[in-house]
C-alpha cells in the first residue's frame, strides 16, 4: 500500500479543489435575469473532460469545512521526512476527514431537531395569542392582511402619510458605537468593525442634515485615544460637510448641521472590538445623555423660544447601539428607531451549522448572547425597525421572540381600526433600501457603452496604475470585487471559480480590493487566513499577471476603481454567503458597472429594481464562473445591464432614502420629557445637591439596611458633605413598606431627597405639610411626570390577566399533587407594577424564560425577581432603578459623576444594571450579605460580559461602618465643594 499512494493524493487534491458547500450538480445555472448558463453544460465540466470519483466524494461528503485548515493539514503531512511515515499520515488524514464528515451529518440532524423543537415551543404561545384575538377580528380581515404588506409591517408609503416640511426643525440622533468613524478619508477595511456600516451612517448623517425640516443631526460614536490611531478619532466633535441636494435649502443657525460626537467610554488607551464594548455601554449612555440634554436646550434657545428641542428620534445602528438607543429613549421619553445591520441569531445559526464550535465557544468568542438579547431589547423599545429587504423581515427578524410576521399583521390591522390589542405591541417594520452618494459619479461611456473621448488634459487616477501593474494584459475586461478578507465574504470561492475556468481567465482579469493592510502577519487571524488562502490559490492556479490585489487604497479612490472596471467593460462581483445591505452593488450600478451578485439577501430585491446583472448561488463556483463569462462575453447583455442600472439607480439615492425615512418618523407621535411643562410643581431639595448617594442594597436584612442608611448619612456629615449631599433610597419595596421601615427606625422621610420604589416603577419625594418636619407632618409626593415617562406601551390590564393565567400554570409537583407556587399580590402592586408572591423560589422558572414568553406574546415589559426571589415584579419596559436615576439626573440637573451608588455582593435580578455608568459604585462586602440565590445562577450570559468589575469607578469595601463609608468616599475622591 505504501508503494502506491496515488489514490490518497487524488483525494487530497480534491479536498484542496472542492469549494465550501460545493453542489454536485452537473450544470451550474445562475439565478435571475437570464441566469448565466442556460441549457449549455458548465464550462468547468467541459474543460475537465472526465469524471473524478475523488472529487465527487469530496464535493458530496466534505462540505462546510474551511479549505485553509485542510491545506495547512496537508502541508504538515507532506513535511514528514520518512516516506513511509508520510504515507501513513496522509492515509490517516483522509479517513479522519471522512469520519468528521459523518459526525457532521449527525450534528446537522441533531441541530435540525433542536431547531424544530424550538420552533414548536415558540409557535405554541403565538398560536394562543392570535387565537385569543381572532374572535374580535372583523370579517374579511384575514384576507386583507394576507395580501397587503402595509398591513403586515406598516411599510406602505401610500395614503395620508405626513411629510416633513422646511418649517419643521428636527434634531435627529444616530448611534453607531464600533469601528473607526470619521467624515473624510474613512479607513474602510482596516479592521472587521470598520466597514460598510461606518460609511452608511456617516453618509446618512450628512444626507439627513441637508433635508428641509432637519435642523441638526448628531452621529454618536466612541472616542478613541489609543496609540497607533489617527488623532482625528479622538476629537470630541467633528463637523460633517452636508450633502448638497438640489433645491434643498434652509436657514441655518449656530448649532445646525451634521456632527460626529465622540463620547469617551471604556479604557481610554485601548481600541475595543465590538464584542468587548458591552460592559461600557451605560457609560456611553450617560455621556451621550449629558450632550443631548445640553444640545436640546441650546437648539431650543435658537428655534423654540427657549423650550428644549428634544430629539425627534434616537436611531441605533447594530445591536450594541440598539441597547444604547433603548436606554437613551427611556431616559428622555423620545421615540426610538433601530437598524440591525447583521443580526446575531442569523450569525449564531450560521456558526452552529458549520459545526466547528459549540454554542458556549461561539458565545465566548462573539458574545453572541449579549448581542441577541440587545436585539430583543431593541424590538421591545423601538417604534420603527428599518430593514433593507423583505427577506430580512420574514426570515431573520422572524427568528426573534419579539417579532412574528403573522402576529404583527394582526396587530397592525387592529391598530388601524382602533380595536383593543390587549396590551400587545409590535414595532413597525419598514423597508428602506440604503442610499448612495452620487457626488463622485463620472461616466466615461455613453448609455450604449461606447467610450466618450477623454479630455486631452485629463490624467488617469493614480490608483489605476497601482492596479494595472499587476496585469500582463491590462486591456482585458476587469472583474472587480470589493470586500474585506473575511470567510463570510467568500473571496476564496471567487478566486477558485476564476482560476479553474480557462475561458474566463483568457477573457478577463480579476481585481480584489480587500481593504488596507500592512503585513499579513500583523492582521487579525481570520483576515490573515483568508489572504493567505487567496495568495495560495493564485500560486496554485498560476494566476500571476491576471489577478490584482493592491495593499492600500484611499476611500476617495473607490469611485475611480469602479470607473476603471467600466473603462475596461468589466463587471462587479459580490458573492458572500449572505449580503445584508449590498451598498457596493448600488455603487457599482451608479457607475454603470454590471454586476454578478449572491442570490442570498438584499441583492435579490436590489436586482428587482435595477435589473443590471445576474444572481448566483455563492456556494457554486461553477455558476459564478459561468455567469461572469456570460456577462462579459455577450456585449448586448453587458450594455443592457449597464443601461438598466443607470436608468433605475435614482431609486437608491440619498434624497429618496431620506424622503422615505423622514416620512416614517413623521408618523410617530410626539414624545418628550413630561416634566418640561410642569417643572415647578414639585419642589425637590435634590435639585441643589452637589453629591447624591443612592442606597440600592438588596442583599441584607432590614436591620442591616437601616444601619447602612444611618452610617452613610453619618459618614457624609463627618466629611463635611451633609449639606451638599442628598440621599436616595432605591429599592423594590413599596412606598408603604418604606414608610413603615423609616417609622420603625425613628427616621424621617426628609432624611432622603427621593425614593425609587417598586424596582423603579414609582418615584416619590418627601413632602412637608408644616414648617417643622415631623413624622405626622410628612407625606410623600408622587412624581406623576415620571409615570407619564415610563408608560410607553404598558400592557396594563391585558398584561395582568395574562400574568395571572401564566402564574396558575407554574406548579410544584409532588407525586400526583400539583401545588401552585406563584400568586397575584395586589397588596404590593401599583398602577405600573404588577406584583406576584412566590411561595417556593426553588420552583421558579428562570427569568429569561418568562421574558421570552412575554416577548412571544408581544407584551413589552420588564420582569424581575426581588426580595430574595420571593416576589416577582413586572414593570414597564422603560422602568428600572437604573433608569429612574437617569430620570432624576435629567430632571434635576444632577451630574452623574457626582453620584455614588451603594450595592451589596448580590441583589435582585436587576443587580447588574446598577454598576455601569459615569457614577461611582461601592460594593459592600461581608457576611451580612445573603448568599446568591437561583435568580443569578441562570443568567443569559456571565456577569463579566456586561459589567466591567475592574473599572476605576467600582470599588469594594469590607463592612458598612461609618469609617468604612468615609474610606470609600475618600477613595472615590468625593470631597466638599
From Swiss-Prot:
GO terms, molecular function: sucrose-phosphate synthase activity
Induction cue: Circadian-regulated, with the highest expression 3 hours after the beginning of light period (in 14 hours light/10 hours dark cycle).
EC numbers: 2.4.1.14
Tissue specificity comment: Expressed in germinating seeds.
Gene3D superfamilies per record: Glycogen Phosphorylase B (3.40.50.2000)
Catalytic activity field: beta-D-fructose 6-phosphate + UDP-alpha-D-glucose = sucrose 6(F)-phosphate + UDP + H(+)
Region (Disordered): 124-159
Keywords: Glycosyltransferase, Transferase
Coiled-coil boundaries: none
Gene Ontology BP terms: sucrose biosynthetic process
Claim: Ligase is one of the keywords in the record: no
Enzyme kind, highest EC tier: transferase
Description of activity control: Activity is regulated by phosphorylation and moderated by concentration of metabolites and light.
Pathway listed: Glycan biosynthesis; sucrose biosynthesis; sucrose from D-fructose 6-phosphate and UDP-alpha-D-glucose: step 1/2
Protein purpose: Plays a role in photosynthetic sucrose synthesis by catalyzing the rate-limiting step of sucrose biosynthesis from UDP-glucose and fructose- 6-phosphate. Involved in the regulation of carbon partitioning in the leaves of plants. May regulate the synthesis of sucrose and therefore play a major role as a limiting factor in the export of photoassimilates out of the leaf. Plays a role for sucrose availability that is essential for plant growth and fiber elongation.
Family the entry assigns: Belongs to the glycosyltransferase 1 family.
Complex and partners: Homodimer or homotetramer.
PANTHER family registered for this protein in UniProt: SUCROSE-PHOSPHATE SYNTHASE 3-RELATED (PTHR46039:SF4)
Protein known as: Probable sucrose-phosphate synthase 3
Organism classification: Eukaryota, Viridiplantae, Streptophyta, Embryophyta, Tracheophyta
Amino acid at each position: 500500500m505504501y508503494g502506491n499512494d496515488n489514490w490518497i493524493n487524488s483525494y487530497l487534491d480534491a479536498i484542496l479543489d472542492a469549494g465550501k458547500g460545493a453542489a454536485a450538480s452537473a450544470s451550474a445555472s445562475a439565478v435571475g435575469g437570464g441566469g448565466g448558463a442556460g441549457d449549455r453544460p458548465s464550462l468547468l465540466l467541459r474543460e475537465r473532460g472526465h469524471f473524478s470519483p475523488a472529487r465527487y466524494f469530496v464535493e458530496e461528503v466534505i462540505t462546510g469545512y474551511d479549505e485553509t485548515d485542510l491545506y495547512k493539514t496537508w502541508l504538515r503531512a507532506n513535511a514528514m521526512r520518512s516516506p513511509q511515515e508520510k504515507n501513513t499520515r496522509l492515509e490517516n488524514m483522509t479517513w479522519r476527514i471522512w469520519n468528521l464528515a459523518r459526525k457532521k451529518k449527525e450534528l446537522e440532524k441533531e441541530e435540525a431537531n433542536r431547531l424544530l423543537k424550538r420552533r414548536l415551543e415558540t409557535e405554541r404561545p403565538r398560536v394562543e395569542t392570535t387565537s385569543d384575538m381572532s374572535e374580535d377580528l372583523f370579517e374579511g380581515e384575514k384576507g386583507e392582511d394576507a395580501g397587503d404588506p402595509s398591513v403586515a409591517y406598516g411599510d406602505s408609503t401610500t395614503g395620508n402619510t405626513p411629510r416633513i416640511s422646511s418649517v419643521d426643525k428636527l434634531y435627529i440622533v444616530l448611534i453607531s458605537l464600533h469601528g473607526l468613524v470619521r467624515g473624510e478619508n474613512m479607513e474602510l477595511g482596516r479592521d472587521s468593525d470598520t466597514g460598510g456600516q461606518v460609511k452608511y451612517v456617516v453618509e446618512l448623517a450628512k444626507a439627513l442634515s441637508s433635508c428641509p425640516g432637519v435642523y441638526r443631526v448628531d452621529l454618536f460614536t466612541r472616542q478613541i485615544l489609543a496609540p497607533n490611531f489617527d488623532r482625528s478619532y479622538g476629537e470630541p466633535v467633528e463637523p460633517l460637510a452636508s450633502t448638497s441636494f438640489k433645491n434643498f435649502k434652509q436657514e441655518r443657525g449656530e448649532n445646525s448641521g451634521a456632527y460626529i460626537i465622540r463620547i469617551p467610554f471604556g479604557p481610554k488607551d485601548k481600541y475595543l472590538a465590538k464584542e468587548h464594548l458591552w460592559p461600557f455601554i451605560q457609560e456611553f449612555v450617560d455621556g451621550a445623555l449629558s450632550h443631548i440634554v445640553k444640545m436640546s436646550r441650546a437648539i431650543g434657545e435658537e428655534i423654540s423660544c427657549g423650550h428644549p428641542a428634544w430629539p425627534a428620534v434616537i436611531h441605533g445602528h447594530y445591536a450594541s447601539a440598539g441597547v444604547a438607543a433603548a436606554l437613551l429613549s427611556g431616559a428622555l421619553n423620545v421615540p426610538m428607531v433601530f437598524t440591525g445591520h447583521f443580526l446575531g441569531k442569523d450569525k449564531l445559526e450560521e456558526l452552529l451549522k458549520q459545526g466547528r464550535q459549540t454554542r458556549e465557544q461561539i458565545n465566548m468568542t462573539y458574545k453572541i448572547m449579549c448581542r441577541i438579547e440587545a436585539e430583543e431589547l431593541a424590538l421591545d423599545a423601538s417604534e420603527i425597525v428599518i430593514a433593507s429587504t423583505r427577506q430580512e423581515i420574514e426570515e431573520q427578524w422572524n427568528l426573534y421572540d419579539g417579532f412574528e410576521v403573522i402576529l404583527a399583521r394582526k396587530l397592525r390591522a387592529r391598530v388601524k381600526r382602533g380595536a383593543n390589542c390587549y396590551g400587545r405591541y409590535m414595532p413597525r417594520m419598514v423597508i428602506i433600501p440604503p442610499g448612495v452618494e452620487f457626488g463622485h459619479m463620472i461616466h466615461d461611456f455613453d448609455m450604449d457603452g461606447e467610450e466618450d473621448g477623454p479630455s486631452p488634459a485629463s490624467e488617469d487616477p493614480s490608483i489605476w496604475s497601482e492596479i494595472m501593474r499587476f496585469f500582463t494584459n491590462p486591456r482585458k475586461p476587469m472583474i472587480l470585487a470589493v470586500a474585506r478578507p473575511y470567510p463570510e465574504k467568500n473571496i476564496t470561492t471567487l478566486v477558485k471559480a476564476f482560476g479553474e475556468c480557462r475561458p474566463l481567465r483568457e477573457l478577463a482579469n480579476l481585481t480584489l480590493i480587500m481593504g488596507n493592510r500592512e503585513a499579513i502577519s500583523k492582521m487579525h487571524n481570520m483576515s490573515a487566513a483568508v489572504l493567505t488562502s487567496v495568495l495560495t490559490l493564485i500560486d496554485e492556479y498560476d494566476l500571476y499577471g491576471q489577478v490584482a490585489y493592491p495593499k492600500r487604497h484611499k476611500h476617495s479612490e473607490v469611485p475611480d476603481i469602479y470607473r476603471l472596471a467600466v473603462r475596461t467593460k468589466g463587471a462587479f462581483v459580490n458573492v458572500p454567503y449572505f449580503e445584508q445591505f449590498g451598498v457596493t452593488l448600488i455603487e457599482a450600478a451608479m457607475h454603470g458597472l454590471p454586476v454578478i451578485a449572491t442570490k442570498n439577501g438584499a441583492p435579490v430585491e436590489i436586482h428587482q429594481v435595477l435589473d443590471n446583472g445576474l444572481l448566483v448561488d455563492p456556494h457554486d463556483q461553477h455558476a459564478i464562473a459561468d455567469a461572469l463569462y456570460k456577462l462579459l462575453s455577450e456585449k448586448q447583455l453587458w450594455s443592457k445591464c449597464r443601461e438598466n442600472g443607470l436608468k433605475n439607480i435614482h431609486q437608491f439615492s440619498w434624497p429618496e432614502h431620506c424622503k422615505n425615512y423622514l416620512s416614517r418618523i413623521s408618523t410617530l407621535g410626539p414624545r418628550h420629557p413630561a416634566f418640561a411643562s410642569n417643572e415647578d410643581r414639585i419642589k425637590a431639595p435634590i435639585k441643589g445637591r452637589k453629591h447624591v448617594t443612592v442606597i440600592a442594597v438588596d442583599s441584607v436584612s432590614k436591620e442591616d439596611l437601616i444601619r447602612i442608611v444611618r452610617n452613610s448619612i453619618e459618614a457624609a456629615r463627618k466629611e463635611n458633605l451633609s449639606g451638599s449631599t442628598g440621599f436616595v433610597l432605591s429599592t423594590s419595596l413599596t412606598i408603604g413598606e418604606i414608610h413603615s421601615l423609616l417609622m420603625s427606625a425613628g427616621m424621617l422621610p426628609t432624611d432622603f431627597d427621593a425614593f425609587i420604589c417598586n424596582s423603579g416603577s414609582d418615584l416619590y419625594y418627601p413632602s412637608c405639610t408644616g414648617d417643622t418636619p415631623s413624622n405626622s407632618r410628612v407625606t410623600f409626593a408622587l412624581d406623576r411626570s415620571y409615570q407619564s415617562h415610563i408608560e410607553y406601551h404598558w400592557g396594563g390590564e391585558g398584561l395582568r390577566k395574562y400574568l395571572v393565567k401564566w402564574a396558575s400554570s407554574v406548579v410544584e409537583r409532588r407525586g400526583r399533587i400539583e401545588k401552585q407556587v406563584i400568586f397575584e399580590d395586589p397588596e404590593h402592586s401599583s398602577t405600573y407594577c404588577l406584583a406576584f408572591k412566590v411561595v417556593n423560589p426553588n420552583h421558579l422558572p428562570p427569568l429569561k424564560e418568562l421574558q421570552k414568553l412575554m416577548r412571544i406574546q408581544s407584551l413589552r415589559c420588564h420582569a424581575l425577581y426581588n426580595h430574595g426571589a420571593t416576589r416577582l415584579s413586572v414593570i414597564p419596559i422603560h422602568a428600572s432603578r437604573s433608569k429612574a436615576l437617569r430620570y432624576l439626573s435629567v430632571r434635576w440637573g444632577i451630574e452623574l459623576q457626582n453620584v455614588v451608588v451603594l450595592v451589596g455582593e448580590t441583589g435582585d435580578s436587576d443587580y447588574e444594571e446598577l454598576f455601569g455608568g459615569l457614577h461611582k459604585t461601592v460594593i459592600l462586602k461581608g457576611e451580612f450579605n445573603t448568599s446568591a440565590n437561583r435568580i443569578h445562577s441562570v443568567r443569559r450570559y456571565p456577569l463579566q460580559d456586561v459589567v466591567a468589575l475592574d473599572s476605576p469607578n467600582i470599588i469594594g469595601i469590607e463592612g458598612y461602618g461609618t469609617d468604612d463609608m468615609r474610606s470609600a468616599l475618600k477613595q472615590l475622591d468625593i470631597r466638599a465643594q
